[in-house]
Amino acid sequence: MKKNLTLFAVIAVMFATLLTGCASAPQFETEAESAQRPILIQGPMPIEAEKFAQRLDKVKVEKSGTFVFYIGKLDKYPVIVAKTGKGMENTAAATAVAIEKYDPIAIINQGTSGGHDPSLNVFDIVLGERTTNIGSLKTGHLEENEGIEPTNWIPMDLMASEGSAGEDPNAEKARYYEGDADLLAAANAVKDKYTKGKVVKGTIGSADVWNNEVDRINWFHENYGTSVEEMEGAAAAQIAKAYDVPFLGIRVLSNNKTNGGQYNPNTAEANQDYVYEVVKQYISKIHEK
């Protein structure tokens, strides 16, 4: 009888240990998953964000102010799509909120853009080897009734110092934010999967200005080296730089006034499809580490 009780006790302990192991395994996996820093994908308008969000698994939606965050998984890795709203201020705020709240491992700002380079066509995609604020400008000194001279305006680097940029001679230049090398490598690795246009490296210009003057567009292209313009990327790049988060802008041409390329709204979905492949490639490299 004593032997039977001893045997029963041993079996009970083994069974309890087995149950504990089974229960702790999912818990360990959950803790491991929660330790993964998400990739943040930004899109300004619904047409530029929601298609990507629909392709995520296990999505939950969170809001902060007017900003919407679609939190899900891609290839079992955490990815967040942020619908930031249009413009530099919205994007800067949404980027800061996302970094503080979600601690992303990398940020991709993507969407549509207008062409500055006449060699680029609608549906072509520009990888932001550089991103710059083309709305930060300093005018010349002219008195009343002396007119305005926009072509004589010069860049103003607000980040050159903590003091007044208007009085700082070192601030009279454009600031370029470099695209992250690993994100660029991922984008280049899958560019042959994009068949609706070509994928090139270039300079993305951003400002809260909608330029319809071709001579003005050409001026930016010549003086800043811009490939395209939009209204968000440089703001996101500036905040990402402040927090030391890897950043890349990816923009598709939805129109190009320099060569007559007409607006096509389908470019927004095409760009999201390409960025989806970029993110999958980037995740595969994370898994290899």
What spans do the regions from the language model cover?
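Bacterial N-terminal signal peptides that target proteins for export
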Residues: M1-A9
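C-terminal motif of bacterial Sec signal peptides marking the signal peptidase cleavage site
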Residues: L19-G21
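A C-terminal functional module that forms or caps the active site or interfaces directly
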Residues: A207-G249, T258
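N-terminal short beta-loop-beta anion/metal-coordinating cradle
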Residues: P26-A96
